[in-house]
Amino acid sequence: QVSLLADKNAHNGALVSIKPSTGEILAMVGSPDFNNEAISGQINMADSPTRQPGSSIKPVNYIAAFEKGWTPATLIWDVPSEFPPSGDPNDPREPYRPVNYDGEFHGPVTVRTALANSFNIPAVKTLDFVKIYDDPNTPQKDGMIGMAERLGITSFTRPDYGLSLTLGGGDVSLLELTSAYSV
């Protein structure tokens, strides 16, 4: 199917299919043509290199919020908002002002609605609540990165992630992300 995207300069792609109940890999395609050096065909694009996952990482953030007492019915205000970019209130840099893809604000929305519509502002507010990194005073890894690790994502290793992490601002392999969805 990658050939159908050639006019968009797409020459490589990957697919991972996992049985959710067991985590068994049912199919994995790392390249459309193993022998094509022009597209790095011998690199398994399903496993490496890592790529930014975009909004597909948002469920990891919301799962961490559920562990801290939120539910799908929890209300979040989707309104103009600003945050310290690192999540640290003492961060001296310009505030981070997330926007939704549609450029609109939707007022009070449930977590269910925010995730179903992939609203960015509620996702960032959720990460601001959950925190990026773990609280050292808790026995369990409880930040978004800790939750990602518990779900099998090992590629979030930088010490400087900001709140855009929940919008796909970190790198992950397709195999790890797909596996996390099966946990």
What is each stretch, according to the model?
Residues 1-51, 55-56, 73-74, 139-150, ...:
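Periplasmic/cell-envelope proteins involved in peptidoglycan metabolism and beta-lactam response
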Residues 21-25, 32-36, 52, 81-84, ...:
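Solvent-exposed loop/turn segments at secondary-structure junctions
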Residues 17-22, 39, 48-54, 103, ...:
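Secondary-structure capping and boundary motifs in well-ordered enzyme cores
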Residues 1, 68, 117, 125-129, ...:
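Generic, well-ordered alpha-helical scaffold segments in large soluble proteins
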